[in-house]
C-alpha cells in the first residue's frame, strides 16, 4: 500500500471525530453532497504539497446516478452509511450496502447509481488538488 493511500486511510479515521463544516458542491439531479471536513495535507505530510484530504457526505436519491469519471490523481475511500449503491467499472457492476466500503485509485474509471427505493448515503474521503 503506497504512502498516499495509507495516509488517506489513517487521516479518514482521525477526521471522523472532527466537527462538521458545511459546503454544498454542484451535483447531478438526485444527488446531494455535503462537505464534512478537509485538511491541507502539506501541513501534515511533506510529500503531498498542494493537496487536501476531503471528507464529504453524499446522498443518492432513488434512481440517481453520477457520470463516468476517473480517479487519476485523486484516490478515494467510500463508506456506505445507509442504503445501497451500485459501483460500475467497465462491464462489472458491484452493489455495496450499509457498513461496506470500497476504494477508487489512480486506474479507476467508474460511475455509481442507486437503483433502490431508499436514499443511499455515502461518506466519501478523497485526496484532491488544493483549489
For each predicted feature, which ranges?
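Extracytoplasmic low-complexity repetitive segments enriched in small/polar residues
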Residues: 43-44, 58-62, 86, 99-101, ...
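Glycine- and acidic-residue-biased ligand/ion/polar-headgroup-sensing regions
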Residues: 71-90
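Ligand-binding loop in jelly-roll beta-barrel domains
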Residues: 107-131
Amino acid at each position: 500500500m503506497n504512502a498516499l493511500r495509507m495516509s488517506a486511510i489513517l487521516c479518514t479515521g482521525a477526521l471522523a471525530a472532527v466537527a462538521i463544516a458545511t459546503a454544498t458542491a454542484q451535483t447531478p439531479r438526485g444527488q446531494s453532497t455535503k462537505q464534512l471536513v478537509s485538511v491541507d495535507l502539506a501541513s501534515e505530510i511533506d510529500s503531498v504539497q498542494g493537496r487536501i484530504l476531503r471528507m464529504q457526505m453524499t446522498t443518492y436519491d432513488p434512481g440517481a446516478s453520477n457520470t463516468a469519471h476517473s480517479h487519476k490523481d485523486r484516490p478515494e475511500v467510500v463508506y456506505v452509511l445507509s442504503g445501497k449503491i451500485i459501483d460500475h467499472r467497465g462491464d462489472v457492476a458491484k452493489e455495496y450496502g450499509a457498513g461496506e466500503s470500497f476504494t477508487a485509485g489512480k486506474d479507476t474509471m467508474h460511475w455509481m447509481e442507486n437503483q433502490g427505493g431508499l436514499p443511499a448515503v455515502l461518506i466519501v474521503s478523497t485526496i484532491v488538488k488544493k483549489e
